[in-house]
Amino acid sequence: TYGDGVSDVDINALYEFHKKNGRRATMSAVKPDSRFGVLDLSNENEVKAFREKSDIDSGWINAGFMVLEPKVLDYVKDDTIMFEREPMEQLAKEGQIMCWKHNGFWQCMDTLRDKEKLEKLWSTNKAPWKVWKD
């Protein structure tokens, strides 16, 4: 996962979906009301392409929670590669990424406003991502 997203993604369900689909990569996807690049998906949830989101677009985005087969590391040639670009786009071209759609809570924390929103949810005991017992 990326370090800037908070979610109640069911990791076990994501992993089980990955095991069943037989692809090299499975990414979680969410449909937020915001400003992210969009995933173009087939009817079977295969990732076909990545594109920048327009003001009128409301597509699925990469939620950052992924299951990857070790072979995916072969797509990373050196430490200058942006993982979201070359490796993931190549996997999509090869039909090797599936998407697991998450309809639960997801929130990025890219801005101070995002941070304050998440802190308010936490401090008022309304944090949907807190799925464990104290």
Spell out what each predicted region is.
Residues 1-3:
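Active-site acidic Asp-centered loop
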Residues 21-31:
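A short, conserved acidic/glycine-rich loop-to-beta-strand motif
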Residues 6, 11, 15-19, 32-34, ...:
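Catalytic-core segments of class I nucleotidyltransferases/pyrophosphorylases
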Residues 42:
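Extended acidic/charged loop-beta regions that coordinate divalent cations
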